[in-house]
């Protein structure tokens, strides 16, 4: 959550609301997790993201697969968007640069939809979408 969709100044990263809305419109479930402070629904609500978010959880910071259960995360992510490279490497997804404040030029979220679309292109033999995780 921090530095991925929220800056140090509490601002919402540019494009976050639009990208979440598009993801949900395309049939994706969106979950938010935080390694700093646990479950943070209040910030999700304040940012206007609640209509798009299916759940908010603590983020596992190590031993990621087992950490999902420890942190109460009921799903294994297919695609992770995070500034924390280790968790993206483990589950698959895209690492985006840290977002610090509204004064920062930032277009990271706008590139996320294209990366998700590329990730879900049919396999060469037509076996359906290519997904990371289970």
Label each PLM-derived region with a short phrase.
Residues 1-63:
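Alpha-helical substrate-recognition element adjacent to the catalytic core
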Residues 41-134:
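C-terminal cap/substrate-recognition subdomain and adjoining C-terminal extension
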């Amino acid at each position: 959550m921090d530095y991925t969709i929220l800056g140090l100044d509490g601002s919402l990263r540019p494009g976050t609301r639009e990208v979440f809305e598009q993801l949900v419109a395309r049939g994706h479930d969106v979950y938010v997790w935080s390694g700093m402070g646990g479950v943070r629904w209040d910030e999700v609500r304040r940012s206007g993201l609640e209509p798009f978010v299916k759940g908010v959880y603590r983020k596992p910071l190590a031993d990621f697969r087992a950490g999902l259960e420890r942190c109460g995360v009921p799903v294994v992510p297919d695609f992770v968007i995070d500034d924390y490279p280790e968790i993206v490497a483990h589950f698959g997804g895209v690492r985006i640069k840290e977002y610090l404040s509204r004064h920062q030029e930032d277009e990271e979220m706008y590139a996320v939809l294209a990366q998700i679309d590329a990730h879900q292109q049919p396999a060469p033999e037509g076996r359906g979408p290519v997904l990371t995780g289970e």
